[in-house]
Swiss-Prot record:
<dbReference type="GO" id="GO:0016836">
    <property type="term" value="F:hydro-lyase activity"/>
</dbReference>
<keyword id="KW-0663">Pyridoxal phosphate</keyword>
<dbReference type="InterPro" id="IPR050147">
    <property type="entry name" value="Ser/Thr_Dehydratase"/>
</dbReference>
<comment type="subunit">
    <text>Monomer.</text>
</comment>
<dbReference type="InterPro" id="IPR011780">
    <property type="entry name" value="D_Ser_am_lyase"/>
</dbReference>
<dbReference type="InterPro" id="IPR036052">
    <property type="entry name" value="TrpB-like_PALP_sf"/>
</dbReference>
<dbReference type="GO" id="GO:0009097">
    <property type="term" value="P:isoleucine biosynthetic process"/>
</dbReference>
<keyword id="KW-0456">Lyase</keyword>
<dbReference type="GO" id="GO:0030170">
    <property type="term" value="F:pyridoxal phosphate binding"/>
</dbReference>
<protein>
    <recommendedName>
        <fullName>D-serine dehydratase</fullName>
        <ecNumber>4.3.1.18</ecNumber>
    </recommendedName>
</protein>
<dbReference type="InterPro" id="IPR000634">
    <property type="entry name" value="Ser/Thr_deHydtase_PyrdxlP-BS"/>
</dbReference>
<feature type="modified residue" description="N6-(pyridoxal phosphate)lysine">
    <location>
        <position position="116"/>
    </location>
</feature>
<comment type="similarity">
    <text>Belongs to the serine/threonine dehydratase family. DsdA subfamily.</text>
</comment>
<dbReference type="Pfam" id="PF00291">
    <property type="entry name" value="PALP"/>
</dbReference>
<dbReference type="GO" id="GO:0036088">
    <property type="term" value="P:D-serine catabolic process"/>
</dbReference>
<dbReference type="GO" id="GO:0008721">
    <property type="term" value="F:D-serine ammonia-lyase activity"/>
</dbReference>
<dbReference type="InterPro" id="IPR001926">
    <property type="entry name" value="TrpB-like_PALP"/>
</dbReference>
């Protein structure tokens, strides 16, 4: 307790985190893209290479997963306006939301129904390509749909993949790895939903369950993989490859906006609200968005009050040297995808200058908004995916933040507020009914 008091003396906001209060923190260390980019350690070239790799795999994905065929083997989600939800939020919270609210439906991405279909699938494909190229079975000029042949499945079956997950990352990596032909083991934390484990097992994936939280599942997965030279461990806490898989979203969103005739510039700012667990997904997406829109995009991470690991790490500057458990928080939340106690040190250090802020919200707030979105827009998400929905009213109420950035009323009126919906498209009906029953 004495240590917590010392921490609070240095970092007053920790008191609100410990009290599980809904908290908003605007980052005083935010810089321009030009100043912040060198600290990421990755470049636009890296993201372009990821884009090209996904293009090489498109013919394979179009055949392996027919639901991607219409998009030519591209795994991408829609952006939709949510005017009725915007009005409902204004009514419920008594706060005008200037500008227009949009929803990015990664919740309905093909293959695994979550944002993790971006990073998880990309890293599995990257590993498969590397093995096939090294073995001389493939060149980058080939039509990658040859990977569907029995010879390739046979080749990949000598190798295995392991990952630790609270659910969605395991789902995307498990389904993709099994399709390629890898043997795959997913180490699941205690908060992983039963239906996600069942779905993985139906794809022939080995699921190892733990009574502990996410950090333990990752650690055990890492250990198990170390003893097998043919086993590749996908490290959600440190993976640059996962990060780049998410980052591709930036250019793609820019193209979607161009198609819709939506302008993002200094007088039409873009605010993006990203649910955050360990940080890889939102970190990678935010990096891609910064490369695509520069200083005209403002990114915020959203976390449960019971799992504010990234806010704690970035705000104190301690990053992965501190966990929410260290300050007496239990890391138990209905937002299972965000139930992470210790943030990625890589993502925190890479992105701390490129985030405008972080905030927390209560589980009940997520349930309430889950219900409102279903009522108003007919869109059903899992609790985690609503974390971003609390962002617009917080930003519109934050006069000091607006003044610091010099936003005029006109600019705010021209703003786009993009809420990144991270999952929920594959939640079974009975489970969804339970979620809806918890909203007020």
């Amino acid at each position: 307790m004495e240590n917590i008091q010392k921490l609070i003396a240095r970092y007053p906001l920790v008191e609100d985190l410990v009290a599980l209060k809904e908290t908003t923190w605007f980052n005083p260390g935010a810089t321009s893209l030009a100043q912040g980019l060198p600290y990421v350690g990755l470049t636009e070239q890296d993201v372009n290479a990821a884009h090209d790799r996904l293009a090489r795999f498109a013919p394979y994905l179009a055949k392996a997963f027919p639901q991607t065929a219409a998009a030519g083997g591209m795994i991408e989600s829609d952006v939709v306006a949510i005017p009725a939800m915007q009005k409902r939020l204004e009514k419920e919270y008594g706060q005008t939301i200037d500008g227009e609210m949009l929803l990015k439906k990664d919740s309905h991405l093909a293959i695994s129904g979550s944002i993790k279909a971006r990073g998880g699938i990309y890293e599995v494909l990257t590993h498969a390509e590397k093995l096939a190229l090294e073995a001389g079975l493939l060149t980058t000029d080939d039509d990658y749909s040859v990977l569907l042949s029995p010879e390739f499945k046979q080749f990949f079956s000598q190798y295995s993949i392991a990952v630790g997950s609270t659910g969605n990352l395991g789902l995307s990596i498990g389904i993709m790895s099994a399709c390629i032909g890898f043997k795959v083991t997913v180490h699941m934390s205690a908060d992983a939903r039963a239906w996600k484990k069942a779905k993985l097992r139906s794809h022939g994936v080995t699921v190892v369950e733990y009574e502990d939280d996410y950090g333990v599942a990752v650690e055990q997965g890492r250990k198990a993989a170390q003893s097998d030279p043919n086993c590749f461990f996908i490290d959600d806490e440190n993976s640059r490859t996962l990060f780049l898989g998410y980052a591709v979203a930036g250019q793609r969103l820019k193209a979607q906006f161009a198609q819709q005739g939506r302008v993002v510039d200094a007088s039409h700012p873009l605010f993006v609200y990203l649910p955050c667990g360990v940080g890889g997904g939102p970190g990678g997406v935010a990096f891609g968005l910064k490369l695509a829109f520069g200083d005209n995009v403002h990114c915020f991470f959203a976390e449960p009050t019971h799992s504010p690991c990234m806010l704690l790490g970035v705000y104190t500057g301690l990053h992965d040297a501190i966990s929410v458990q260290d300050i007496g928080i239990d890391n138990l939340t209905a937002a299972d995808g965000l139930a992470v106690g210790r943030a990625s040190g890589f993502v925190g250090r890479a992105m701390e200058r490129l985030l405008d802020g972080l905030y927390t919200l209560d589980d009940q707030t997520m349930y309430d908004m889950l219900g409102w979105l279903a009522q108003e827009e007919g869109i059903r998400l899992e609790p985690s995916a609503l974390a971003g929905m609390a962002g617009p009213q917080r930003i519109c109420a934050a006069v000091a933040y607006q003044q610091r950035h010099g936003f005029s009323q006109t600019q705010l009126g021209n703003a786009t507020h993009l809420v990144w919906a991270t999952g929920g498209g594959m939640v079974p009906e009975d489970e969804m009914e339970q979620y809806l029953a918890k909203g007020r």
